[in-house]
Amino acid sequence: MDILCSPPYPLPMKNDLPFIVGIGASAGGIDALSQFFKGVPAQADIAFVVVTHLNPDRESQLDKVLEHKTEMAVRVATDGERVSAGTVYVMPQGSFLSISSGRLKLNELSPGTREHQPVDLFFSALAEDQKDNAAGVVLSGGDGDGTLGVKVIKEQGGVTFAQVADGEPPLNPE
């Protein structure tokens, strides 16, 4: 997977916040995430928020996996944490993420809840909060989660990307 992650110009800061990229992936998207972050320079003036479909009954090691794939700081998102450049935030298990005024908000899943669209929920909140200071990237998965969220990001002036299945011609960002 070829990904261009280093623009030839500095990205604008909005309200002292870096450009924020939401990345949505299915539970099987570890390889795609690993490849993505191998191409991101450590000094990137970007913050990344990774939203995945996690099994609430199994402990996630995604933050540890990504730490070995990038020189950027990687950490599990905490409630109220202000997003900062050069950091990869990973959605914690048993919750879903939103964002308000550049601060991550954790919302716990109700017990027994399995069916939700965490990527759409985060992307929609990101678009409303950051407008054109946001991008959405959908990696792997066929359940449609992320489809509505990227529409909202695009409507608010942000940029959207989607992974192309192997063997298909690459698409330009919209």
Where are these regions (language model features)?
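Conserved acid/base catalytic micro-environments in cytosolic active-site loops
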Residues: 2-174
